From Swiss-Prot:
Interacts with DNA gyrase. SUPFAM superfamilies: Probable bacterial effector-binding domain (SSF55136). Keywords: Cytoplasm, Stress response. Belongs to the DNA gyrase inhibitor family. This is DNA gyrase inhibitor. InterPro entries: AraC_E-bd, DNA_gyrase_inhibitor, DNA_gyrase_inhibitor_GyrI, GyrI-like, Reg_factor_effector_dom_sf. It is found in: Cytoplasm. It comes from Pectobacterium carotovorum subsp. carotovorum (strain PC1). The gene is sbmC.
Amino acid sequence: MSIRIELAESMEVLSLRVVGPYYEKIPQGFDEILSWAREHHLSIDKSLAFYWDDPSKVEADELRADVAITCKEMPSTLPEDVGIRREVIPGGLYAVTHTIVENGDFAKAWDDFYKAINAQGYCPAGDICYESYLCDGSNGKWDIEIWQSVEAAN
């Protein structure tokens, strides 16, 4: 797997927290946030999923993720009752890869990505890691970019 190291700018997103098995809760979260965005006539630029827990260390029903979108024009206010928040994702140094995920095997893509980061002389830094979806996966294949904040390994 090839990666690139990129100095990214901060990014404003609208996000919704989901808790539970990633394979189950992330699609449900996207259904909810995308439905909300359509109801509010928002023009979506990107769909992202931020992962806050390592599935090898946290029970599946306690896994936390944020599904998020970026919009051409962000709404000035957000309703308090739907759980959608405005957040700024910090800029900085990130490792990035572009890959195709088949048969729902996102774990393999992440494993390969982390091996490539280490092979390039970097290690994860901070907690920011996410997927940026370049298609809707309706054909069973997910065209994605994976992003991880990094620093040079010592």
